Amino acid sequence: MGDMANNSVAYSGVKNSLKEANHDGDFGITLAELRALMELRSTDALRKIQESYGDVYGICTKLKTSPNEGLSGNPADLERREAVFGKNFIPPKKPKTFLQLVWEALQDVTLIILEIAAIVSLGLSFYQPPEGDNALCGEVSVGEEEGEGETGWIEGAAILLSVVCVVLVTAFNDWSKEKQFRGLQSRIEQEQKFTVIRGGQVIQIPVADITVGDIAQVKYGDLLPADGILIQGNDLKIDESSLTGESDHVKKSLDKDPLLLSGTHVMEGSGRMVVTAVGVNSQTGIIFTLLGAGGEEEEKKDEKKKEKKNKKQDGAIENRNKAKAQDGAAMEMQPLKSEEGGDGDEKDKKKANLPKKEKSVLQGKLTKLAVQIGKAGLLMSAITVIILVLYFVIDTFWVQKRPWLAECTPIYIQYFVKFFIIGVTVLVVAVPEGLPLAVTISLAYSVKKMMKDNNLVRHLDACETMGNATAICSDKTGTLTMNRMTVVQAYINEKHYKKVPEPEAIPPNILSYLVTGISVNCAYTSKILPPEKEGGLPRHVGNKTECALLGLLLDLKRDYQDVRNEIPEEALYKVYTFNSVRKSMSTVLKNSDGSYRIFSKGASEIILKKCFKILSANGEAKVFRPRDRDDIVKTVIEPMASEGLRTICLAFRDFPAGEPEPEWDNENDIVTGLTCIAVVGIEDPVRPEVPDAIKKCQRAGITVRMVTGDNINTARAIATKCGILHPGEDFLCLEGKDFNRRIRNEKGEIEQERIDKIWPKLRVLARSSPTDKHTLVKGIIDSTVSDQRQVVAVTGDGTNDGPALKKADVGFAMGIAGTDVAKEASDIILTDDNFTSIVKAVMWGRNVYDSISKFLQFQLTVNVVAVIVAFTGACITQDSPLKAVQMLWVNLIMDTLASLALATEPPTESLLLRKPYGRNKPLISRTMMKNILGHAFYQLVVVFTLLFAGEKFFDIDSGRNAPLHAPPSEHYTIVFNTFVLMQLFNEINARKIHGERNVFEGIFNNAIFCTIVLGTFVVQIIIVQFGGKPFSCSELSIEQWLWSIFLGMGTLLWGQLISTIPTSRLKFLKEAGHGTQKEEIPEEELAEDVEEIDHAERELRRGQILWFRGLNRIQTQIRVVNAFRSSLYEGLEKPESRSSIHNFMTHPEFRIEDSEPHIPLIDDTDAEDDAPTKRNSSPPPSPNKNNNAVDSGIHLTIEMNKSATSSSPGSPLHSLETSL
């Protein structure tokens, strides 16, 4: 494409480029050129920009965008950009087709056994012994009616058909589950928005809509959604470890390193960038595409080599625990592993298998329970088969003394196959394969409904873990309060105003300082916009504390925008942006006479300590002594704080023109010797619904703690208003430094015993840093002082809250105020930032737990009865009263349909009236065990009575001891029908697990339950009346049906009888399904601690491997690719899909073990040459400390003595050489 304009185009030409975009068909820069530019680093990138485009404005010109106005937003222009440069979207891995899911469902071992047995049965049923030989085969073949022999194949075919039904139902469930997860994934993507400038307006658009040429505003906490080049930056620091492996934050500036890469985190500062690459063309996209494509191409080869590899290298591939990757929203790649085996292998294995968090409580309990039930079922089915075979052999060859005739062999084998099928059906019924389905359905249903309750669940298991929560550590601002801040009090010109004063009451020079200081020393992204509806409140955009200060100016009848127009963001000389360590923000202005003025704002106690002067009543600065400061603290700040106000101090300092220029990087020397302008009290009202929500939590046995950065008096006042603290209670309120002093020993190390003395009584942690929050959360989780280990939920919104959110059992991020980094580290996103939504999450979590318990109570009752009936019946009557096909139908009711019916019960407020279950609470309580055994007893009595006396009662032929291929009997049909109807009515009983009397309460609120129960009943009628030979059923009369229904309904009456027996009397009942025992935990926790300690080190290596793999295909020779592949690609499994760039960096990608594999360097000679060179080959610093493009004095003087192929210091290739 031809250049649209010369590189030295005047700045005015940039503004006109928007108009040109409408009629000029081509851009002045190609996709390939942009990709090549974004692959360069630091000095190489600067050289390329200077040589080819002049500066970043030259790139804006070629992309036909304005650095100040952005794109016009014209749909035709946006479409053309997407067509040329691509869409900001990485295509997800194709979902599994329905046929693939069917194939996966067919892999079930019990179903395979059943299929084989059915095929054998089918084949043998066509064999008939020669005429006249029937008598020789003994009684086994007697009793067949004429024509019945020909229908012997039906049972085998019916079993196959039933297996097909089960497989189709399973596949359909998996398909709908996957569809739902993809829906959740797209919902998460839609939630991700980014701030851009279009048509001169600052707007937020979905990440997928960002296109090349957009001017994006980046700020602290953002996860960059695309590649770009910096136009203007304020103290911008980026965490690039996810891509380059460098664990140190990288300072971005126009004169050193202006390239911003997708998938990296903004850790400090703010700025604007022009987007240069999106989607698969961004750096994240390129690597993702290469890994994905490479994996698919090599997948087949890998599979062929797998066996050989496993033999050659022990444990080459480590399967990582994916507790957090079930939902498809946060898939993880398989870790790499060293080829070196040896003694360290076991340690390596443990380390590689470190989960993000320990396995979810419910999963652990269910797995344990399922294994126990499975073992019992296998034992029962084996005993059943052995008894049947022995009974048959002894009766035929011992009692009847028959010889084994060759022509009778197929008949005998048919019997053995029949016995085998009975054994397998016992196993099928006994093994609770419906458990995982019930969990999935319950979680998926809950997740869908929780979205309506403003909980966007990113990790499925967080949903059920929330039901066990015993403690919530909540932020204050925005979660407990409304996050709509207003200045309500002020201390200006030595007067304490209880409401905002009139502008006339303030001396003009103080007012001037106040207006300028607030206007320029608040982020320019913070602003107050007119209300959306007439009569509504003005909209606060950006940081809410800054909006309160801007609101103060409006109350003083001054317009901050006039000041900002006069001093645009580009003109700010230096900005010390706010972070959790500074707790302040400062901005330096350069005056026309060469002097400087710095404005500071921040926590009052921090800024006041740096003030040596204060503006007096007449507007003059006077000395501010320590005792004056103490007076202000006592008479102004403490009274404000006790009313729950946040106090902010505003100050300034002048640097005269004649003095040498200060050392701007030495912040401590700059932000000191200040003159105090004012102290303001900002009110952030408690959300009206919060006190009630906290009361519910306390009633539900959940302790709520407030962790805030505000001072202790403000925090205490708000905690009292919320109901976290009550007057007269003996609870602790600590400041961060006091908390640290109490929990650390003389060496400064944290001791768990010290934390254990504090946390049970701690309710408020004020002036705390994110590190304090992490320490508290970890201390509570690791504590063993209480009987139950604590399950902790945490809320967070800042970038530095990531560690605490990850450490917590459930991390809640704020959907509105939260940074992208916090959202990526969280399990659930609160879309309304409201504490009451957390209470709803607790309800849903407990509901999931109860739903699983309801299903277990129902299923185990069926299991016990079906297994005992099949076993006893088979041993006594030499045949199972419930046939294989009938068992499969029961299994279908029991597993799939019941799990759907019971797992979709909506939650009720009553769930919050009991204490949390905790980690070690068994899944099956003694009340549930009483219900299971009580109902099993009733059902067994009914079934055995019908089995051994039913024919007399109903005056029909007995179905016992029927010969092979005998027609279905009414007797056994009644047994089957009654058995199914008892399960159906017991499903209603199973809705209550805490001994409640009214089992029908709320039944009509669950349409799915009612539909399934009625649907099952209708299908049962069809099976019995029209099922015939395939279902081994004979038509029943109305009288027989009424008796079956009556006996089925008896379970409801029997349930009432069971409820009257107090559980406390039944001491002999055991609980089942316990969680992880206490002594099993420390190892996991220890491993997790090791993970945290080694995080930075592993982060470094992980990032390098990731970059190395992406770059080696693009930038280096084929021999290096081959060498690299031979050493590293072995043992790498194909990464699973991610659907968008934004989610690509969700989790750490690779784990490299301590014993590092040998990785060939890109060029060993270069590495040696580079070693002695100094790393300061960057250009001399610009006199403009803010690194803005407006400053024409930027010198892009770069050393040109390096060859293009060698890696310059600071580049990713160089860091690879030096580190790897």
UniProtKB/Swiss-Prot annotation:
The chain crosses the membrane at residues 106-126, 155-175, 367-386, 419-439, 856-876, 883-903, 928-948, 972-991, 1006-1027, 1040-1060. Isoform B: Ubiquitously expressed. Isoform C: Found in brain cortex, skeletal muscle and heart muscle. Isoform D: Has only been found in fetal skeletal muscle. Isoform K: Found in small intestine and liver. Abundantly expressed in the endometrial epithelial cells and glandular epithelial cells in early-proliferative phase and early-secretory phases. The modification N-acetylglycine is found at G2. Residues 1118-1220 are annotated as: Required for basolateral membrane targeting. Mg(2+) binds at D475, T477, D797. It is a multi-pass membrane protein. GO terms for biological process: calcium ion export across plasma membrane; monoatomic ion transmembrane transport; negative regulation of cytokine production; negative regulation of cytosolic calcium ion concentration; positive regulation of bone mineralization; positive regulation of calcium ion transport; regulation of blood pressure; regulation of cardiac conduction. It is found in: Cell membrane; Basolateral cell membrane; Synapse; Presynaptic cell membrane. Changing T425K: In MRD66; decreased calcium ion export across plasma membrane. The modification Phosphothreonine is found at T1116, T1165. Residues 2-105, 176-366, 440-855, 904-927, 992-1005, 1061-1220 are cytoplasmic. Belongs to the cation transport ATPase (P-type) (TC 3.A.3) family. Type IIB subfamily. It is linked to Intellectual developmental disorder, autosomal dominant 66: An autosomal dominant disorder characterized by mild to moderate global development delay, impaired intellectual development, and speech delay. Additional common symptoms include autism, seizures, and distal limb abnormalities. Disease severity is highly variable. This is Plasma membrane calcium-transporting ATPase 1. It comes from Homo sapiens. The lineage of its organism: Eukaryota, Metazoa, Chordata, Craniata, Vertebrata.
